[in-house]
């Protein structure tokens, strides 16, 4: 799980782009993370961001959190993975 300070950093970084929902999934959500784990974040933005903006946000989150971040948008989530993501998903902002 992530700390409330880490949640604040995530929300602060992503708030510039008006997210409708932000959640974590994967090993951090299940409490199975270790020092090699990345932090999987699912986000639904009000407006579409281009690839460079998403990469920039991912890098900013990685730098500010000190954890490798994978930023996934709701619209880019494949139908095959949707079930697994939703099963683990812990919303941190709506």
Language-model-detected regions and their locations in the chain:
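Catalytic core of pol beta-like nucleotidyltransferases
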Residues: 1-23, 29-35, 46-94
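Conserved G/P- and acidic residue-centered "switch" motifs that form tight phosphate/ATP-binding loops
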Residues: 26, 40
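Short hydrophobic/aromatic beta-strand micro-patches
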Residues: 42-44
């Amino acid at each position: 799980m992530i700390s409330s300070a880490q949640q604040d950093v995530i929300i602060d970084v992503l708030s510039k782009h008006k997210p409708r929902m932000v959640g974590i999934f994967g090993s951090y959500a299940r409490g199975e993370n270790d020092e090699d784990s990345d932090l999987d974040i699912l986000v639904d933005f009000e407006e579409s961001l281009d690839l460079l903006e998403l990469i920039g946000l991912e890098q900013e989150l990685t730098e500010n959190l000190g954890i490798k971040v994978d930023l996934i948008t709701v619209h880019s989530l494949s139908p095959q993975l949707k079930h697994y993501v939703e099963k683990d998903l812990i919303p941190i902002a709506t």
